[in-house]
Amino acid sequence: MAREMVAPFHEAQAWVEPEPKARQSIVARGLSKWFGSEQVLDDVSFSIAEGESLVLLGPSGSGKSTTLRLIAGLETPDSGEISLRGRRIEHLRARQRNVGVIFQNYALFPRMTVAENIGFGLRIRKWKKKKRGEVVNRLLGLIGLQDQRDKFPSQISGGQQQRVAIARALAYEPELLLFDESFSALDPQTRTGLRREIRALLRKLGIPALFITHDQEEAMEMGDHIAILNRGRLEQLGTPDEVYNDPQTEFVATFLGAANVVEGCWREGFIALDCEQCLRAPRPMTSKIATDRIKMIFRPEDVTLGGPTGLVETPHHLGRGEVIDVSFTGATESLTIKLLPRGYTGQLPNLHCGAGSDKPCNLMIKAVRTKWEAKKLRLAPGSAVSVGLRSYKIL
């Protein structure tokens, strides 16, 4: 698909906000859903504050789309409650919920013009023609498509079709907007620009929104909060910063961005890794006993590298390593590092395993450096490095 230029949304002063309504969040409690003998949702709960956006993120089959269909009224939960601004809606039909849905394919009517598509819902609701025309004109101004009003969907770009779909959903003043992977069909440049503009528009209008996506970058950018689903269960719910920097499960750590996972055990204030290295625990772990197995998780950008004879400036020294692979990705450089046996690291501070060991260490870790860090210390496959960590988390 050829790249398209996306003009910014017009300022929203042309939009006349509806009369203030009860400022309550949408709340889902204990949602469960079965399809035959398969449970696709298991006790999922979340809420969205007024004017905020929640992103449901997860792999295929995690229950994202089923959750959206339950909120939209396209499916009925087997158990659980859904409230919108204090009103129970799980028993209501879709058209009774006052919820707008923007689908992946936009679902525009091909034989209706842009203006007719935007006003379709109002016509179905039997709004008078004059009032309907006023709303359509305001929305065309809001999305910057006044000069496209008489064109058909096939005559405008994908980004413009997305805007028409949003305007159509906004026409009848919904209390909630649902986006079902609505950006996936757009080229990367259009998708990035449109995401930012839609987020700004939603904030300006104060409309809560629920986004469904498997795109991690989209989730981080669009969501005030992110709910990560896996096999029908809610793994973690939090702000983008919380779920990325403080993952509560291995799945969250490895699904939302890249992560190194190293196994070991707990030893009275230290972490003994399976690769024969030891690190001081980052904080007291009173819930652990000496035989407990643990997993240490750290992001590639948490790894810091130094030359073979010096020490990296970090409180957590992981040891010596050998560069196995280097790839340049533009703004960053990605490396694969193989940790060397403990015999190479016996003199490093913060390592307390005693004498060296001949036991091989087959642990591979991923590291990411900025282009400026890469220029400061040139590395290639076969280079020896000292390896440290800026931070890590124990599960």
Language model regions located:
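Conserved post-Walker A/P-loop segment of ABC ATPase nucleotide-binding domains
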Residues: 75-83
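Helix-to-loop junction immediately C-terminal to a conserved catalytic motif
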Residues: 72
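The feature captures the beta-strand-to-loop junction immediately N-terminal to the Walker
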Residues: 57-59
